[in-house]
């Protein structure tokens, strides 16, 4: 069963869409395109990934109040790709949906964060939550400056993901509170 579980996690490419209806007025659509890890950040797959997110977000006939994309769903760093991303988001949010997307982002000091960003019905950022518990050797090198491997690269440069300043809750336009845990923080 362990082999089957590994295969399901690593090789299954079945996209997942889950809709949660608390009542008939508020629909949450959770989208999981199941992009293979070895393709996630390759530029030649970027358009394919975006098309997949877009298609799955629009798949159901009913419009969603909130669409949720997974951690690091968008294959670019925000806000470097802000105009491109906002153009895509505006196409998805035509029915006045909001979007919660996991993404890597830079701040004004060019520090890198793993974040969840809530986009309002106009495609503008309405709130940010940053990851607080990083994965050692996956998102940062512990004690990097004290060891000879301080020049080891995680993301094609010597940049670690930082613990972000934004924590707490996000609020939708309907004043629904969203408590966000990103990946490793759930454990």
Predicted features and spans:
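Enzyme catalytic cores with a strong preference for nitrogen-chemistry domains
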Residues: 1-187
